[in-house]
From Swiss-Prot:
UniProt cross-references to Pfam families, sorted A to Z: Methyltransf_11 (PF08241)
Organism (species): Bacteroides thetaiotaomicron (strain ATCC 29148 / DSM 2079 / JCM 5827 / CCUG 10774 / NCTC 10582 / VPI-5482 / E50)
Family: Belongs to the methyltransferase superfamily.
Protein's GO biological process: biotin biosynthetic process; methylation
Record keywords, A-Z: Biotin biosynthesis, Methyltransferase, S-adenosyl-L-methionine, Transferase
Known role: Converts the free carboxyl group of a malonyl-thioester to its methyl ester by transfer of a methyl group from S-adenosyl-L-methionine (SAM). It allows to synthesize pimeloyl-ACP via the fatty acid synthetic pathway.
EC number: 2.1.1.197
Enzyme class: transferase
The protein's name: Malonyl-[acyl-carrier protein] O-methyltransferase
Catalytic reaction list: malonyl-[ACP] + S-adenosyl-L-methionine = malonyl-[ACP] methyl ester + S-adenosyl-L-homocysteine
Amino acid sequence: MNKTIIAERFSKAISTYPREANVQRQIANKMIRLLQKHIPSPCPKVIEFGCGTGIYSRMLLRTLRPEELLLNDLCPEMRYCCEDLLREKQVSFLSGDAETISFPDKSTLITSCSALQWFDSPEEFFKRCNTLLHSQGYFAFSTFGKKNMKEIRELTGKGLPYRSREELEAALSLHFDILYSEEELIPLSFEDPMKVLYHLKQTGVNGLSAQSSLYPKHEKQTWTRRDLQHFCERYTQEFTQGTSVSLTYHPIYIIAKKKKV
């Protein structure tokens, strides 16, 4: 993963992400309901990695009432999106790559919503989270599965190396007891393929791979008008449902507890 490119894309989408990220907001709401069901509250020490503009963060603060809430994101600029949260004395922000930066230990909960798919090695990160958690700590996250944005992958051959729910569970179970897991498909409808591309750009996902964009060649090379027309024609032909075209999200939700030694 080219983390620099990832950070640049999401930084550019800061002003439009909250408006366009309806699926991510829906997923965050569901994550909160699952946390309320499976994790004791209040939850004293919470780390959220990949906090973005703070959609999930605000829900965490309101619902879990942590004594300490550490927000982390790859993009330093996300701090400014969370200024209202950072006015609360128990909330702090740490920018950097969650796979490599230092986090405080003895946390009660490490959690994330719609971020893990950008990691180089979720499996190594699971091991790391186990060492950072309190002996009775929890690890809860949502990510995306192999059918996420399947329409884009089918047309361009590009996409992230998504893990299946079974692969995630197998890696997690080495360090955690899995309390709950679920996956679902969320289809979105758009007027035409151009609206799909606009949606992806406005949410920071204008390239589905960290190394390459949707475009067929180099990261900085844009499509020609003919390329764009061909993409839209194929998208319309293959993914029209009624009077609109579809884009599929494939969220996976997992709640786990640190294994007893």
